[in-house]
């Protein structure tokens, strides 16, 4: 569902990247993929479930990242740098292929 300042999401969702998405830590909504969660938050699955929760937060804190293999990108996400093993999201412009962040 699209959103902006004049078309807000319902109160249990957050407007992120002009889409109504599940906020970090929500107990109201289940996610099926990381695309269901706000930008920078990953869907975590437990015990083989087909649905999960948006509980892995990779957003920058005060413009910085704590992991030296990541850096804060223009979306304010701590993304893994080129060539790094992708244990979470890759930096904007990179994708995880064969276990590493690549252009």
From Swiss-Prot:
Domain of life of the organism in this record?
A: Eukaryota
Question: Care to name a GO molecular-function term for this sequence?
Answer: ion channel regulator activity
Kindly state which keywords UniProt assigns to this record, in alphabetical order.
Answer: Disulfide bond, Ion channel impairing toxin, Neurotoxin, Secreted, Toxin
Q: Name one GO cellular component term.
A: extracellular region
Disulphide-bridged cysteine pairs: none
Q: Is this entry keyworded Cytoplasm?
A: no
Subcellular locations according to the entry: Secreted
Expressed in which tissues: Expressed by the venom duct.
| Protein modification | Contains 8 disulfide bonds.
Main subcellular localisation? secreted
State its role.
Acts as a neurotoxin by inhibiting an ion channel.
Domain remarks in the Swiss-Prot or TrEMBL record: The cysteine framework is C-C-C-C-C-C-C-C-C-C-C-C-C-C-C-C.
**Name assigned to this protein:** Turripeptide OL55-like
């Amino acid at each position: 569902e699209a959103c902006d300042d004049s078309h807000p999401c319902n109160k249990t969702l957050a407007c992120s990247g002009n889409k109504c998405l599940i906020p970090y830590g929500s107990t109201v909504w289940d996610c099926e993929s990381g695309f269901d969660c706000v930008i920078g938050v990953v869907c975590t699955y437990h015990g083989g479930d087909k649905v999960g929760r948006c509980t892995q937060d990779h957003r920058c804190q005060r413009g910085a990242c704590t992991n030296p293999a990541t850096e804060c990108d223009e979306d304010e996400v701590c993304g893994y740098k080129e060539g790094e093993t992708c244990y979470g999201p890759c930096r904007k412009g990179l994708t995880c292929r064969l276990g590493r962040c690549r252009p």
